[in-house]
Amino acid sequence: MATIHLLSDFKEFLRLLNAHHVEYLLIGGYAVGYYGYPRATADLEVWIALHPANADKVVAVLKEFGFDDPELSADLFLKQWQIIRLGLPPARIELTTTISGVDFGECYAAQVTDVVDGVRVNLIDLDHLKTNKKASGRHQDLADLEHLP
């Protein structure tokens, strides 16, 4: 697969997700790059499983990462179609609870786990990534779809 370089904050965040056993999948531009179409991206997009135990783990990760806001609660990660953004592009981290066209459980069961720039990462598999890109229908997603194998 393609060589990908992660910002140090992204590496730290992914390591924390792994250390806390968060059920997550890397999606978006970094996943597209992993499958052979490296392109500029403004953020690290992470899809998280939507259930209470996982939401608690995500909150623990965010606090350890330095994002300890009084409004931070597990409830933020228990709603469908929720997107939480941390930081600014190109170093933004985006957490989402739902994406178009695919089911987290199915995607998690089919995940690809690999070491990316020295960090173990759970990625959405290529078939589900393509399904998501097609279902999303955004211009960038359709362009990605044309370049994926």
Predicted features by range, described:
Residues 1-149:
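Compositionally biased terminal segments of proteins
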